[in-house]
Design a protein with these regions (language model features):
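Non-catalytic substrate-recognition and accessory regions of acyl/acetyltransferase enzymes
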Residues: 1-98, 106-162
C-alpha cells in the first residue's frame, strides 16, 4: 500500500466530474432541502487539467441557522491515501430529524460509486452527528467504505420502517 502519492500520480478529478458533482449536490438542495436558488458552489475555480481535490460549499441567504454543507472530494490524508475520498467537513440542517442527513449520505454514496470514491469520512462530528453516525454504522474512526456505507444506510432505513 502506498503511504502518500505524489500529486501527478493521484487520479485527477476532471472538469466534467467537478461539474457533475456540483450539479448532484445542487439537485440534492433543490429536491430534498427545497432550496430554489443556487446554493452550492465550488470554492475554487474548476481546473481545466483536473485537480486532486475539490471543495463544495453551500451558503445561506438570510439570517439565522440555515442548511450548511462543506464537502471535500479527492486526495486527503485519511485512511488509504492512494484512494479518492469524500470528506464531510461541516454539515448543519435547519430542520433536524427530517431525513436530510440520510438523504445527503445516499447522494454522496451515488457520487462515490459513479466516480470511484472509496470511502467517506466525517470530520469533527458534534454529539448529535455522532449519535446519527452510530445508527448508520460508523465506528470510532469516523469513516466507512462507500459500499459498506450504502449497505448500512439500507439496513438503517429498513430498521426505521418497523
Amino acid at each position: 500500500m502506498l503511504d502518500l502519492l505524489e500529486e501527478n500520480e493521484f487520479p485527477k478529478i476532471q472538469k466534467d466530474e467537478q461539474s457533475e458533482i456540483l450539479n448532484t449536490i445542487q439537485n440534492f438542495g433543490e429536491s430534498i432541502l427545497k432550496r430554489s436558488e443556487e446554493w452550492a458552489y465550488i470554492s475554487s475555480f474548476p481546473q481545466e487539467d483536473g485537480t486532486t481535490s475539490l471543495k463544495i460549499c453551500s451558503y445561506s441567504s438570510g439570517l439565522g441557522i440555515e442548511d450548511d454543507i462543506y464537502l471535500r472530494f479527492g486526495k486527503y490524508h485519511i485512511g488509504d491515501q492512494s484512494e479518492k475520498q469524500i470528506v464531510v467537513a461541516r454539515i448543519s440542517f435547519k430542520k433536524r430529524k427530517s431525513g436530510y442527513g440520510t438523504a445527503l449520505l445516499k447522494t454522496l454514496c451515488e457520487i462515490g460509486e459513479r466516480y470511484n470514491y472509496v470511502s467517506l469520512h466525517i470530520e469533527e462530528p458534534n454529539l448529535d452527528c455522532k449519535a446519527f453516525m452510530k445508527k448508520i454504522g460508523f465506528k470510532e474512526d469516523k469513516f466507512l467504505p462507500i459500499l459498506k456505507l450504502k449497505e448500512s444506510i439500507e439496513e438503517y432505513e429498513s430498521r426505521k420502517r418497523f
